[in-house]
């Protein structure tokens, strides 16, 4: 099960990396708090329109991998072969980003992709999605590192 956990975590890291390629545009203007330049908003919004709406069924693959990751982690916990701290830490590192994506990041990305809001609100959404993705990337990176170190008995 550990190889499945690291594979799922690695896949999610790759997806986050792609998202961050677009999200990083908003980092150049993070201190202003105002509207992002229109070409930047258009780029980020177009990406999230494709990623959340027009890329189906591929966009559902990400949710499926999150579900597989959590199910595999639950199965691994029932086996009783891993230290409790590893399982609890892993549950937090995988569960928090999943819940954040479900409750905030994906709805914000969908709204941003629709471009129905004011430029100021779209800028806020772009910054929020970027912040969420940075947090999720850190969590998934730590998750993968934990399971790779465990597999290598480091």
Predicted feature locations:
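Hydrophobic residues within membrane-embedded alpha-helical segments of Major Facilitator Superfamily
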Residues: 8-12, 68, 93, 139, ...
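Individual transmembrane alpha-helices with interfacial aromatic-anchor signatures
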Residues: 55, 123-142
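Core segments of transmembrane alpha-helices
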Residues: 58-73, 136-144
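Short alpha-helical packing/oligomerization segments
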Residues: 82-107
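Juxtamembrane boundary at the C-terminal end of a transmembrane helix
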Residues: 147-154
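Transmembrane alpha-helical segments of integral membrane proteins
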Residues: 102-118
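Membrane-helix exit/interface motif
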Residues: 24, 63-79, 104-107
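Interfacial loop at the N-terminal end of multi-pass membrane proteins
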Residues: 2-66, 114-126
